[in-house]
A protein has these predicted regions:
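Short amphipathic alpha-helix segments
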Residues: 70-89
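Hydrophobic, Leu/Ile/Phe/Ala-enriched alpha-helical segments that form helix-helix packing faces
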Residues: 26-36, 81-85, 121-129
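DNA replication initiation on ssDNA origins
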Residues: 1-62, 169-172
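Short beta-strand
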Residues: 91-97, 134-139
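DNA replication initiation modules
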Residues: 1, 50-72, 107-176
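A generic structural motif
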Residues: 99-106
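Short connector loops at helix/strand junctions that flank enzyme active sites
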Residues: 58-61, 87, 98
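Structural recognition of the beta-strand scaffold that forms the well-ordered cores
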Residues: 64-67, 91-94, 102
Length: 176
């Protein structure tokens, strides 16, 4: 299992930079979709799995990944999400395509199923005037491709962990 700090280090590091730059130059959606599935690492923010499907969920992580696609003004939406009145931000980064955002928030399911809680969160987001959330995230086993984003945001509570340098990877070596 990897944590928020591991993912942040990966995203802000150089590990996915070549494939992110290549993807953003692609013109067709089918080509880009194939490229993502074969060239990008991914994680499942919402849980730990034996195999990546809902029935193989070992433990929910207490996190939810909200995906905003085709965003007109990335910086404006980023600020609105960081200042959201109901949800805290654990991690926020630009999607592999470069035209969306991935927003990782903490959740307390309190016995709710992931997909029902996700829909409630999506409705709350919509009610506060933000763009529609991609509903594919309602699948607890949904993978999230990890791009290069040197400007990714991580919650300040992780400051000490982010600054701790427990290893010195060689160029191209994955941090986890």
């Amino acid at each position: 299992a990897v944590g928020i700090v591991d993912v942040y280090r990966y995203i802000t590091g150089h590990y996915a930079q070549p494939q992110t730059e290549a993807l953003r130059l692609m013109l067709t959606s089918p080509e880009a979709k194939r490229y993502k599935t074969t060239h990008f690492d991914y994680c499942t923010f919402s849980g730990l799995f034996g195999k990546r499907n809902e029935k193989e969920l070992i433990m929910h992580s207490g996190l939810m990944c909200l995906d905003f696609d085709h965003v007109e003004d990335i910086m404006e939406l980023k600020q609105k999400l960081l200042n959201h009145e109901y949800f805290d931000t654990e991690l926020l980064f630009v999607s592999p395509s470069g035209n969306g955002l991935k927003w990782i928030i903490p959740v307390d399911l309190k016995g709710w199923e992931h997909f029902r809680y996700f829909k409630a969160v999506a409705n709350c987001i919509k009610a506060t005037g933000l763009p529609l959330v991609d509903m594919s995230g309602s699948d607890v086993a949904r993978s999230c491709f990890l791009p290069h984003d040197p400007q990714a945001y991580i919650n300040p509570k992780y400051k000490d962990d982010v600054e701790e340098n427990i290893f010195r990877p060689r160029l191209g070596e994955c941090p986890f």
